[in-house]
Amino acid sequence: MKLSEILKICSGNEVADFKYSVVCGNTDADVTGITSDSRKMQDGYAFVCIKGAVSDGHKYIDQIKDKASVIVVLDGEYEAKDCKTAVVSTDNTRLALALMSAAVYGSPDKKLFTIGITGTKGKTTTTYMVKNVLEACGIKTGLIGTIETIIGDETIPAHNTTPESIEIHQSFAKMVDAGCKAVVMEVSSQGLKLDRTAGIMFDIGVFTNLEPDHIGPNEHESFEDYLNCKAKLFKQCRVGIVNADDKHTQDILRGAICKVESYGIGDNADIKAENIELLHEPGKIGLTYDCTGLVNMKVELNLPGKFSVYNSLCAIAITRHFDVDEEALKETLKHVKVKGRIELVKVSDDFTLMIDYAHNAMALESILTTLKEYHPHRLVCLFGCGGNRSKERRYEMGEVSGKLADLTIITSDNPRFEEPEAIIEDIKTGIAKTTGKHVDITDRKEAIKYAIEHGEPGDIIVLAGKGHEDYQEIKGVKYPMDERVLIKEVLEELKGN
C-alpha cells in the first residue's frame, strides 16, 4: 500500500483526529509493513518513533533509515538531513502507530463485530463468557485479554492486558482470515491511555466497575486520570453497555457519543438480576437468579458471588445484540470456566477447592468475603506474595486473610530475587494484627498437599495468587509450575499412601 493511501485512511478515521505534515520524501513510496521496534525493522516498513519511559525511537533513526519507506516522528524531535526516505511529523506518534497499523493490515477492525470491555474487575471472566456464548451459537469469535489471545484454534500467551496497536490489528487480520465474525477484548486503562485501541470504533463498549487501582508513577498519576482513560472507550463505540450500580458510571459516560444500555441489581438497570439464591454442595458452588427487563430468563451459574452475577448480566446484555438462542445462552453460562478465575478443581466429595488469581488485598478481600456468604465449615486461604514488589501488599494481604479466613497457609508465589522466607515473614506481620490462625509452608506444592490432606467436610479452600500462571519465577528464571499439575501430583501421592 502506498504511503499516500495510508495517510488518507488515517486522516479519514471517524473517531480519531489525526494531524500530520510531510517533512520530506515521496508519499508514493510503497509500505510493506510497520513497526516501532528497530530490531523488527525490515525493508519497506514504516518506522514509527515512540518516546517511551525507557527508550526513545528517535534515537534509532540512523540505524533503520536505509530500510524504511517512511519514518514517523514527533513534531520537533527530528531534523531530516536528506530526503531519500519520507519523513512524516505528527504531535502523537502513538496515535499514528494505531491508525497506520489498521491501514497496513487492511482495516480488519471494520470486518469484525468489535466488543471492548473496560473496568477494574470482571473483564477477563466476561470476555470468556461472551466468547463461549457466541461460539455456542455458531458465531466464530476471537478473544484478546489478560491471559491470552485466541484466534480459532491458536492461542498466544499475553504480555499485556491490551497489546500494542500493531499486535491488535495483526491479530484482527488473522481473525478475519480464520473466519471470525466477532472479537471480544479487554481494554485496559493503560491501553486507552497509550492509544493502543485508538481509531477503533467498537460496535459495543462495556464498563464493568471502577475502584482505585493501577495508580502510581508507572501507571496513572491520579484516580481522575484512571477514570478519564476508562471513559475514552465511550467516545469510540456505537453502543455503551454499563453497570448501572457503579457510582462512577455517570462520570465514565460524560462526553460519551454512544447509545447507552445498562445492567445491574438495582431498579434502574435495563437488564437486572432478581431473586438471587446461593448454591453450595461439596465440590460445587454457584448461584441462580431471575434475569428481567430487556431479557427474561432463569440463570444458573457454577460460579460464586455477586460479582459473578454482574459478569453474567454483562455477558447477557452484550450477546442480546446477536439474538442468541436462549437455551444455548443458559447452558453456556451454567458451565463457563475461566482458567485461574474462581476455577473449581475437583479433589474431594467432602470439600471444595478452587484456584483464583487474587494477587492483591482488594481482590483477596473480594473473593474471601464472597465465599464466607456460603457459610463453609472452614474457609482456608493459601497464598504467597511476589518478590521485588511492594511490602505493603504483603502486610495488607496478610491482614485480609487473617481477618476473613479460618486458616491461612502462607507459602511462596514468585519470590524473584528475594528469599521466600523473608516474604513470608512480611505476610505474617499483617496476620499478626488479627486473631487468624496460620501455618507456613514455603514449598507451594507441599502447601497444597497440606491443604488437601487436612481438608475437612464442608471446607472451601482457595489457592490464591497464581491463577492462570504456569510458572514460578526464582532468581530471574521462570520454572514450569501449574497449580493444576501440582494438585494432580498431590492427589496421586496421597492415593499411593
Residues covered by each model-derived region:
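N-terminal leader/targeting and accessory segments in enzymes
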Residues: 1-99, 235, 247, 269, ...
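Acidic, Mg2+-coordinating active-site environments of NTP-dependent enzymes
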Residues: 66, 77-83, 178, 193, ...
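Non-catalytic positions within long, well-ordered alpha-helices that form the structural scaffold/packing
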Residues: 61-66, 176, 198, 372
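Short internal beta-strands
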Residues: 69-75, 240-244, 382-383, 406-414
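A short, gly/pro- and small-residue-rich
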Residues: 57-68, 87-92, 96, 202-209, ...
